[in-house]
Amino acid sequence: MRFSMLIGFNLLTALSSFCAAISANNSDNVEHEQEVAEAVAPPSINIEVKYDVVGKESENHDSFLEFYAEDTATLAYNVTNWEDTNITIFGVNGTIVTYPHGYPVADITGASIGPYEMEVNGTSKFGQDVTLNLPEGQYFLIPFLLASRFDEIVRIAAPPTLFEIVSPPISFFNPQFLSVQVIFLAIIGGVSYYYMKSKTNQRPSKKSATVKKVDESWLPETYKK
């Protein structure tokens, strides 16, 4: 009996040691993963980025801003520096992804701006034009600002904007619409012509009236021809 208890105690001790070793190993792995993540993560920066799409202001951020293909969206930025040191904004770029799946479909062409030297708690305002060369559909617009702090370059993401590319309204003078009108009028004219022609062919011809000779025997001589 004592021998069985001794074996059980030894097994429990071994299992406890094994679990402790696994726990310590997992803890080391978690710490290592955190260190790697911190090493590869982009540097954080305390910058507040707001912007409006000029001419498309909307109070509801969940609604889609409508554009036509090849339209240009003008972004008016308002950036505030909440860092405890000065920073410099020197560029803008970004990406466009599909909604709701988030597949990248276009890059916003990078452009140099400023540079804008922003003091602590300072604010800068500037603009950016984005040409929407996209097919019809729904998208996310995600702009990025490029800034420098000390000797490091940071990429600052701005809030995404929902927008939609819609088909343009058809103008009365649109060549495609005019061609449809011409074809429609030609069809009406052709049908009318053949209808009138068939009616004319079906109309019975009038027989020439025969001239009857009048009996003049009863007339006085003065009235006879």
Curated annotation (Swiss-Prot):
Give the membrane topology: Single-pass type I membrane protein
TM stretches of this protein: 170-190
Q: Which residues form the signal peptide?
A: 1-24
- The biased composition feature labelled Basic and acidic residues covers 212-225
Lumenal topological segments: 25-169
Phenotype caused by lack of the gene: Displays increased levels of spontaneous RAD52 foci in proliferating diploid cells.
Stretches in topological domain Cytoplasmic = 191-225
Record InterPro entries: TRAP_alpha
Q: What else is known?
A: Present with 7110 molecules/cell in log phase SD medium.
What does the UniProt record say this protein does? Is probably involved in a pathway contributing to genomic integrity.
Report what the protein is called: Increased recombination centers protein 22
Q: Which organism is it from?
A: Saccharomyces cerevisiae (strain ATCC 204508 / S288c)
